[in-house]
Swiss-Prot record:
Region feature (Disordered): 119-190
Name of the protein in question: 12S seed storage protein CRC
Induction of expression: By abscisic acid (ABA) in an ABI3- and FUS3-dependent manner.
Impact upon substituting residue 170 to Q: In strain: cv. Mr-0
Gene Ontology cellular component annotations, sorted alphabetically: protein storage vacuole
Keyword check for Phosphoprotein: yes
Post-translational modifications: Proteolytically processed during seed maturation at a conserved Asn-Gly peptide bond by an asparaginyl endopeptidase to produce two mature polypeptides referred to as alpha and beta subunits that are joined together by a disulfide bond.
UniProt record similarity statement: Belongs to the 11S seed storage protein (globulins) family.
PROSITE patterns xref list: 11S_SEED_STORAGE
Known tissue expression: Accumulates in seeds 8 days after anthesis.
Quaternary structure, from the entry: Hexamer; each subunit is composed of an acidic and a basic chain derived from a single precursor and linked by a disulfide bond.
Signal peptide: 1-23
Major place of residence: other
Amino acid sequence: MVKLSNLLVATFGVLLVLNGCLARQSLGVPPQLQNECNLDNLDVLQATETIKSEAGQIEYWDHNHPQLRCVGVSVARYVIEQGGLYLPTFFTSPKISYVVQGTGISGRVVPGCAETFMDSQPMQGQQQGQPWQGRQGQQGQPWEGQGQQGQQGRQGQPWEGQGQQGQQGRQGQQGQPWEGQGQQGQQGFRDMHQKVEHVRRGDVFANTPGSAHWIYNSGEQPLVIIALLDIANYQNQLDRNPRVFHLAGNNQQGGFGGSQQQQEQKNLWSGFDAQVIAQALKIDVQLAQQLQNQQDSRGNIVRVKGPFQVVRPPLRQPYESEEWRHPRSPQGNGLEETICSMRSHENIDDPARADVYKPSLGRVTSVNSYTLPILEYVRLSATRGVLQGNAMVLPKYNMNANEILYCTGGQGRIQVVNDNGQNVLDQQVQKGQLVVIPQGFAYVVQSHGNKFEWISFKTNENAMISTLAGRTSLLRALPLEVISNGFQISPEEARKIKFNTLETTLTRAAGRQQQQLIEEIVEA
């Protein structure tokens, strides 16, 4: 009787486990995502879709491709013509971008942060002594939406987070202008907005989920940006489909690739009733309807008519100070950078900032959460590589990240080996092509021709690699006895394998004649 009871309990437990597994399989994991990383063959990927706008175009890679689906990312290339403006958008996934070509001005809107860039020039037609409409608080009235607390700040109390300096600047209510303003500034600001930054070739910049971002091409050539969305990131609470939300403009050709491409995509205002918009923004209904861009067919990249006037600092110096890049104190006090003032970009195309540099071979530069703290929030990082002719990157693998390699110039050969020891990729890669290198897959990169340049995005804020050859390699760390017994070779041969390569990252790729000479020397 006891045995029968135990048998029934065991049977019930097995059925419960099986039921839970089946429920998870049917509800939690869609069929198209099951076994999505069974990659027996890798391909060099090309952009599959192009969406054109008035002043540029966006090219997408199919995020449903097995390789991109495996690593959980979506990739796009933005081409913004001179004078083009990429309208404000935000995503549900973290985004990291690299400027391949050109210069521009970018801005990101972080919810809850103040407008720290202000233009104190008087507006056209503004009369002397007449405040800007909506800024009647200079006489003691609060701004619209402030209430008593904001009104008290006008009586000499500092704003939250200002301190004595800000308080002194606010004592201008008795006739003194705000700190940094003259008589014109006392009349009101022409414009106020959040931080604006210059971007140029070689810049890596990141965007957190939900933070709107815009960019303007201020240069004389097309601004080309390659961007990656980490749709498998924990901050994306939806499915593994890239979702872009537009604050302005309409895209009649579709969304961010994949399943959204067949459906026209409008901005967020289009879904609201015009009367509701008018009440929320305190404007008339006709202007509210204009926000919905119902008849706008320019797309998401529009051409700016006339000069593009935003408050921005002068173009930064070519080299930032080392003190800024490497602060004296290894532990911050929490005041240096907040989410509002945090830098969102870092240039990694400057040879002076290379982590590995050999003039005859090339250079490698990485950016992670230590050099760009915002990457800690998005959990992404990047590596810039340049190989000279007949050079190679020693075989290695990514320990804790997937890698998405994009060729920015030249040609190169890439070989990738999977967990079964099979060569799953051995192809030439050229400008504009993409290669997915899953975590743990070993690979080697060789230049083909004069030069090979690339940018790699990695799905970890502090991605780590392990080399298979060289002075700091896995083989170098093994005892000779392990190598000789593992490969059934003599101790002398094991010594050659372990110590012959002195480089750590880059080396010279031997040509056929050089390789034949080495073999003759070894045989002799």
